[in-house]
Amino acid sequence: MNISERVRKLRAQSLAAEERISAERALLVTRFYKSDEARDLSAPVRRARAFEYILRNKKICINEGELIVGERGPAPKATPTYPEICLHSLKDLEILNSREKVSFRVDDEVRKIYEEEIIPFWKGKSNRDRIMDLMTPEWLNAYNAGVFTEFQEQRAPGHTVLGYKMFRTGFLDLKEEIRRSMESLDYYNDPNAYEKSEELKAMDIACDAIIMYAVRHAEELEKLAAVESNAARKAELLEMASICRKVPARAPETVHEMLQHYWFIHLGVITELNPWDSFNPGRLDQHLYRVYKKEKEAGTLTDDKLWDLLGCFWVKFNNHPSPPKMGVTASESNTYTDFCLINLGGVKPDGTDAVNEMSYILLDVIREMRILQPSSMIQISRKNPDSFVHKALDIIKTGFGQPSCFNTEAIIQELLRQGKSLIDARNGGASGCVETGAFGTESYWLSGYFNLVKILELTLNNGFDSRTNRQVGLETGYAKDYRTFDELMEAYKKQVRYFADIKIRGNNMIAKTFAIWLPAPFLSLLLEDCISNARDYNAGGARYNTTYIQGVGLGSMTDILTSIRYNIYDTRRYTWDQIMEATRNDFEDYWDIQHDLLYDTPKYGNDDDYADQHAVMVFDIFYDAVNGRPDSRGGVHRINMLPTTSHVYFGSVTGATPDGRKAFKPLSEGISPTQGADKNGPTAVINSASKIDQLRTGGTLLNQKFSPSFFEDEDSYACLTALIRSYFSLDGHHIQFNVVNAETLRDA
């Protein structure tokens, strides 16, 4: 693939565009809520009317030369805010404008709008205000101590993926489904019939709104065509206008129509609310291949046109930074990327190899575009050819960090264990970082990160947190009180269960706030069974409902427990008093102790059963405290093991630890070993990681670093493919390769 001049310019424009705050959406939603039209409406209808008002009044942006149209803001990287979810103060805006990393320019006009209209109306009324008022002192103490985080305090649910249906369905078809569901309501025997009718009414309004929004683009394109002097561009504008009058009202039938159809849906989801890990198209090669093959056979699609369409589509994702985050939410995941994860490969619904020509084409797009968004991954099944993996390695070896590699068989087994049907499991994949989901049928919420190491710190200090000077955990005793390792683990288990109880209670209350005050009628249209159930996405309307809690610091916890067991209980090299004194002083003047803890103690990641047994212990304790516990949407809680950047935040609130780690330094990430602890190569790492039962999770993250020189060997592809397949044969979920040299790491 060679990037055309058109795509080259659009890519350059996207890369050069400055991330800035746009007040457009915040102003429109505020004016709607203040209007007479918003009064005396049910919550779902009010939200649908607000959605319609925004789409009717927001600026239409058509960028020069593009073939896929639509921006969330008035220009590329003009990023909206969502005051009904989280209201930014003037101080917040100043921080966003001036902070060194992940900043957003805030101009005087935006500040004025916030000061005069946004803040006066929403102060004390945002869902974040509502959440913090509802939380118990125990929840607030744990949150402030850094025991866990809460995703929904600044974002909305919506961590889900478009399934097959919506690539073959138009919104006029959905309106017909809504009509049938409305007619089936039983006002005689169903006490919730009226509430269901309001939900369906809201969904119907949302259908009309997205169709109207597409027509507005068609009208703007026709205006541009009327004054366009270049005949070729004029024809493109008219073709695009025709497409916007067709999709998303009706089902797409060409590659161009399908990409534009999806993009309007994407904009609808991220305009309605600001879902964590923004909605994404999922298994894009599977969706596109059907129409691509039809067009190629008919001779209606050239390679050049296809490359242009896909390049323009890729740029669209990069034009949309993740909405700005503040405070703890910024610390846990402060990135511009919105984690829209394109899935390639895997298996078909009948279980056969799904790799096709489009899979390879899209890998070419990823290689040539090389931009931050969208993210990408390959699902690797036993049935996929090695040539598919090698094609991905062509990109990985360049140090781009994409695509990541996922185990199709593990994903399917994880989903089957959770009660999904075989077809829904095969049609699923991963979204966000590594999170497993049944695409098009599952509402899966990420509720926050869980600091496994902080809980041990509290366990060693009778539940008291010296950083916040509060009694945060249970009074289970001090380090010196634990006469045996088993006594320590029993106390740790009680603390984990205690904090899981607090977190899950909070999760269920928070979910109710979204169901009651912030339903998502547009998003509900896209998930199977919300229409037939006449129930909102945020209220459990989807076929499957799951709430995840993400464990962080497994590698660190493993090394800490290994060190405690080895140095205190087994070899008796040190006493608890010596270890606690050294950690209280951050190992200042205790270098000899720190040296032994760091360099003369078994470590996770080296295929050492003595160390690795503790990874299994920690995993099982966390799993037992969370898995299967009911959520408020009719689903259950489950666990993931991933950090985004929360391992850095969690480290910053955790003191020095008995593995030799200095105070406030980062914890380990995902299920990877502690930084620098693995000494026996990548095979030992995957053997250690595979000792935990990853199939009981909804996703685990394993990062591996390789030097560029590794790929100079002609056998490197075969070796790395064998490593991946070996790990996946051991039920590993995910592996990602960062290719960097030592000099780059030192500079970083």
Each predicted region: which residue ranges?
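Heptad-repeat amphipathic alpha-helical coiled-coil interaction surface used
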Residues: 211, 218, 222-225, 234, ...
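Conserved catalytic cores of very large enzyme subunits
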Residues: 2-202, 232, 236-239, 243, ...
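Extended non-globular scaffold/tether segments
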Residues: 201-212
